[in-house]
Structure formats: C-alpha cells, structure tokens
C-alpha cells in the first residue's frame, strides 16, 4: 500500500532534504513522484513477498557475479531520475561502465542515474494499475528493460523497446541485449 504525504506547495523537498527525510525514517520506504509528491510505502512487506524478492535478487546477483557486467541493487536502493522523481525498484541493475562514471560521493548517496534494468514485484497490497503506471514512468525515464512480476496472476510483464509482453511464470524470461545470457523461469523462483 502506498500512502501520499501531503506537503504544502511551498514545502517541496530538495534532493538533499529528501535524503535527510529518508535517513531520519529508515523504517519507511520513501519515494518522490515527478510532481514532487512524497510517497510512503508501508513497511515491512509480508514474509512471502520478501522471500520472492530475495529470490529475484539472488538470481540477478548470481548472473552478474558470473558475468561481471555491472552492479545489482535491492529494494533498499533509490535513484533520482530525469523527471525529478526519486524511485526505488525491488531489483535494479546498472552496467559497470555507467556505474563507474559516477563519483565516489554519488555512489555513497542516492545517485542521479537511471538503472538499465529494474524489477517491480507486486505484493499482496500493491495496486496493479498503479504498478503499471510506475513501470511506464521507469521506461519514460530511460530504463531499457523492466519486469513487473505478479505472483497473483502468475505472469511477468516485460517492458522492452516500446512494447509490453506478458510471459507466464512457466516460460523462460530472457535478459534481451541488456542482461545478455540471463534466462529465468519465474515458476522456479516464485511459488504459486
């Protein structure tokens, strides 16, 4: 469940103030949309969703460790995006070349960089319509490949090259030309 935090117009947070808000409230998952609206996701997630998320992170991390192609992030990460939003996906991956272009101070904060790949995992309390809108915003900001994983429907929506494809959990998902060589079957990661 995502709750909007109402802030007077004159009270729009700067990036530094938003980071301070996040640090002062580590138990909350805080994001900002492109209009400056602060969004708070209730924490913690349910046990099953947390387990699924761990499995997804493990698979992407394992592929990346073998290929040494970039950096993997979990659901505690966040990124400042070109539309002025700050978003945190459940899983993110950034190519090594792009990650290495950041300064050390950027790497130690919330960086202004768009992940190459993200995964959003629908929890029991997430609204699928809102998640689909969020996926569209990820793509508009420059994410090259995005997966919306829905244990409820046993499907993954794949966003790539301006198209959306629905892949049933029993079929193989590929990393396209972004995570080259990655192949996963969601049914083997997420129990129905």
For the regions a protein language model found, what residue spans apply to each?
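Gly/Pro/Ser/Thr-rich low-complexity, intrinsically disordered segments predominantly at protein N-termini
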Residues: 1-192
């Amino acid at each position: 469940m995502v709750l909007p935090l109402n802030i007077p117009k004159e009270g729009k947070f700067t990036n530094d103030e938003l980071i301070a808000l996040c640090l002062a409230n580590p138990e909350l998952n805080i994001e900002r949309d492109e209009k400056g609206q602060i969004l708070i996701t209730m924490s913690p997630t349910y046990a099953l969703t947390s387990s699924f998320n761990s499995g997804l992170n493990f698979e992407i991390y394992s592929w990346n460790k073998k290929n040494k192609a970039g950096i993997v992030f979990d659901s505690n990460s966040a990124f400042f995006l070109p539309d002025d939003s700050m978003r945190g996906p459940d899983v993110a991956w950034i190519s090594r070349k792009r990650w290495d272009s950041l300064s050390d101070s950027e790497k130690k904060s919330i960086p202004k960089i768009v992940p190459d790949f993200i995964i959003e995992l629908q929890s029991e309390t997430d609204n699928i319509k809102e998640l689909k809108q969020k996926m569209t915003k990820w793509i508009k900001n420059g994410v090259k490949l995005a997966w919306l994983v829905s244990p409820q429907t046993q499907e993954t929506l794949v966003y790539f090259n301006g198209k959306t494809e629905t892949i049933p959990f029993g079929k193989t998902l590929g990393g396209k030309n972004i995570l080259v060589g990655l192949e996963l079957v969601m049914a083997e990661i997420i129990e129905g």
